[in-house]
Amino acid sequence: MHKAGFVNIVGNPNVGKSTLMNQLVGEKISIATFKAQTTRHRIMGIVNTDDMQIVFSDTPGVLKPNYKMQEMMLHFSESALADADILLYVTDVVENPEKNVDFLEKVGKMDIPVILLINKIDESDQKKLVELVERWHSLLPKAEILPISAKNKFGTDVLMKRIQELLPESPAYFDKNQLTDKPAKFFVTEIIREKILRYYDKEIPYSVEVVVERFKEET
């Protein structure tokens, strides 16, 4: 028996989606900074074993779009609801659960397994965490709720085991040697953009775009 499926990661900006994706895949697939909406594209990271293939998909943060690029980014997040076999909805210990109610309603109507992940629990205490679990359960009663700290790898092993249990029977969707759907040139531009956003603040526009004019891979 072989299992395979798409596990899509959604949630608001700056809750740790990209950090979680990198931890689950075991490679740095998505760049991460302290700035909201660092992720602009939908990026896949693929985990392969002999009898399993998990296709993770990181998406831009959900928010009301104010310009064309944000409209495109929201489209990526909404498309992740349409083709997921398992949905990971990521929040954190400081986020207001009532934020983006319209998007949450769409999540609540889905007929696939939804795992709600309360991230950054290392920045909270037990009492607040219990309150958050109760509030989120009232908003998404069908979702499984799992507290994690993606940065510290707390709860990620439990999450991975649960994903493997929920994964449907299916042949592999991608070659077993493939790690992502993006070419090397894409990751070069993303790494450069990550460094710009991390080390510069007001010196450059927040919506900076990196263009690599020439790229040559060493053999």
Task: Set out the residue ranges of the language-model regions.
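Flexible glycine-/small-residue-rich
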Residues: 11-12, 58, 118, 212-216
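Canonical P-loop GTPase G-domain recognition
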Residues: 113, 122-184
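Conserved, well-folded catalytic cores of nucleic-acid-processing
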Residues: 27, 46-50, 65, 84-87, ...
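Conserved nucleotide-binding/hydrolysis micro-motifs of P-loop NTPases
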Residues: 36-38, 60-63, 93-97, 121-124, ...
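Conserved C-terminal guanine-recognition region of P-loop GTPase G domains, centered on the G4
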Residues: 48-51, 72-145
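P-loop NTP-binding site
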Residues: 184-219
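Conserved G1/Walker A P-loop phosphate-binding module
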Residues: 1-75, 79-81
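Solvent-exposed alpha-helical segments within well-ordered globular domains of core cellular machineries
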Residues: 8, 22, 41, 45, ...
